[in-house]
């Protein structure tokens, strides 16, 4: 498993809004912070940090990437 600390997502422990609070959020989708959008744009750069063909001893090769 590969750990990328820059991809951490903070999840609130608060419950979903009650019916009387429904007007506080846009309908359909929750608002996405700008930082999350910026991280998605930076993702291809992070995927190219390891030069192709660089297989150090003890380092597993990554054969697939999962977009976040």
Swiss-Prot record:
GO biological process, one term: axon regeneration
PTM summary: Phosphorylated on Ser-59. Phosphorylation decreases stability and activity.
Location (main, coarse): cytoplasm
Record bears the keyword Metal-binding: no
Subunit structure, as described in the record: Interacts with FLNA. Interacts with the latency-associated peptides (LAP) of TGFB1 and TGFB2; the interaction results in a decrease in TGFB autoinduction.
Keyword line: Cytoplasm, Phosphoprotein
GO cellular component, one term: cytoplasm
Entries under InterPro entries matching the protein: Neuronal_3.1
Function: May have roles in neural function. Ectopic expression promotes axonal regeneration. Also augments motility of gliomas. May also have roles in cellular differentiation. Induces differentiation of fibroblast into myofibroblast and myofibroblast ameboid migration. Increases retinoic-acid regulation of lipid-droplet biogenesis. Down-regulates the expression of TGFB1 and TGFB2 but not of TGFB3. May play a role in the regulation of alveolar generation.
Descriptive protein name: Neuronal regeneration-related protein
Top-level taxon of origin: Eukaryota
């Amino acid at each position: 498993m590969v750990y990328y600390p820059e991809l951490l997502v903070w999840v609130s422990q608060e419950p979903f809004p009650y019916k009387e609070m429904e007007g506080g959020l846009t309908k359909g989708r929750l608002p996405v912070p700008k930082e999350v959008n910026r991280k998605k744009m930076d993702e291809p750069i992070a995927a190219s940090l390891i030069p192709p063909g660089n297989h150090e001893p003890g380092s597993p090769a990554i054969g697939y990437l999962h977009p976040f």
